Amino acid sequence: MLKDADSFRGAVDGLLDKIGKRKVDVVVGMESRGFIFGAPIAYKRGVGFVPVRKLGKLPADVVSVEYDLEYGSATLEMHKDAMKAGARVLIVDDLLATGGTVAGTIELVKQLKGEIVACAFLIELTALKGRDKLGGYDVVTLISY
């Protein structure tokens, strides 16, 4: 899908349609495919983009959270100055599976006192019940199966 311009545009525009008119100050995308979909969404919405990276990949002071994976745990980080308190945040990633990565990202946003508007995903694997880990936040997806 990424190598085909029409498919990629369709995915980004489809997510934008699902996100609708929600007021957003910043888009947060998780390493690495969250960057691919989050950055163009931020651009189209006229807001900033904040990357969430794995441990040790960001150059400045960070907030961090350890989160559970199917096979262990890992650490996510975000710059401490990534957003102002009260910023309206849209979290974007390609896939919602078990929900561990996005739950960790939600915790990072909370540490910086951001307000999560929604979590947007290209694909949701409903059988893995990742949505259950998201604390009732609004979730939008293009494809669910």
Residue ranges and their predicted role:
Residues 1-145:
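PRPP-associated nucleotide enzymes
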